[in-house]
Amino acid sequence: MSKPIQMEKGVKYRDADKMALIPVKNMPTEQKEVLRKPEWMKIKLPASSKRIDDIKSAMRKNNLHSVCEEASCPNLAECFNHGTATFMILGAICTRRCPFCDVAHGRPVAPEAEEPKKLAKTIQDMKLKYVVITSVDRDDLRDGGAQHFADCNREIRALNPEIRIETLVPDFRGRMDRALEAMIDNPPDVFNHNLETAPRLYRKVRPGANYQWSLDLLKKFKEQHPNVPTKSGLMMGLGETKEEIVEVLKDLRAHGVTMLTLGQYLAPSRHHLPVERYVPPAEFDELKEIALELGFTHAACGPFVRSSYHADLQAKGEEVK
């Protein structure tokens, strides 16, 4: 019997090392056959540009992170060229080890106290009008990092009074009430928490998470802040059925969620969960129509849609796909 990996504090574990720590052994760490990408998934990525280099430089200068880079998002160049970025606070090491995600796992260091001020100044320097703030899971913190979110919101608005802030939060497992209380006075303009997949697949896709808990988090935030839109997103192509996705959409509406993102799952490496199916664009269009019929005010649905993809346009209700 092999010895478990002894994690060192502050060290990033990725790919095979990260997957070896998954407690649920119901998937291979390396898939034997990789589905070939269909034509609609083959896009030419934009070349690097001064705008991309400037954003990366600003983040490096202040020791900030973007989920765009840490999670290897395929839309990085497009979003950076558009002048938008999703900042990832509380470090770049996650206490969870979800097998779909490319963010590193490990034992994170203590949050940087000056990060909210650095983030606010960077956003001011970049002249952003809409910003998305997300984080790794921080199960090592008493409030899951919620107070840090609130501090970031406060500092960002102090330097950028006209800005709109969207927060894409973790589930604050076991700390929901404490987390919501921490954010009570400094809520975002859009509150986003992703369900990611159908409840049947949670054990495989989101080990350690709970479907109903995530729904309750969205509902309780909405009850506290009825004028703040709530938002959630799902990945397609992990083995779910269309019927299961429709049921999730109904659950989201029953818990007050009005904004939705649906996108194609892409495996970050051969060590991650494999893509079970590439969902045709027409199916995304059909699900969008269903979502609007169910009462979502905005639904961004398409192969390359991600939860923060053109989030500024999503918040305005413009077409995103």
UniProtKB/Swiss-Prot annotation:
It is an enzyme of class 2 (transferase). Pfam families: LIAS_N, Radical_SAM. Residues 80-297 form the Radical SAM core domain. InterPro entries: Aldolase_TIM (IPR013785), Elp3/MiaA/NifB-like_rSAM (IPR006638), LIAS_N (IPR031691), Lipoyl_synth (IPR003698), rSAM (IPR007197). The keyword Cytoplasm applies. One of its GO terms (molecular function) is lipoate synthase activity. SMART domains: Elp3. Its cofactor is [4Fe-4S] cluster. Keywords: 4Fe-4S, Cytoplasm, Iron, Iron-sulfur, Metal-binding, S-adenosyl-L-methionine, Transferase. Pathway: Protein modification; protein lipoylation via endogenous pathway; protein N(6)-(lipoyl)lysine from octanoyl-[acyl-carrier-protein]: step 2/2. [4Fe-4S] cluster 1 binds at residues 68, 73, 79, 308. NCBIfam families: lipA, PRK05481.1, PRK12928.1. This is Lipoyl synthase. It comes from Aliivibrio fischeri (strain ATCC 700601 / ES114). The lineage of its organism: Bacteria, Pseudomonadati, Pseudomonadota, Gammaproteobacteria, Vibrionales. The gene is lipA.
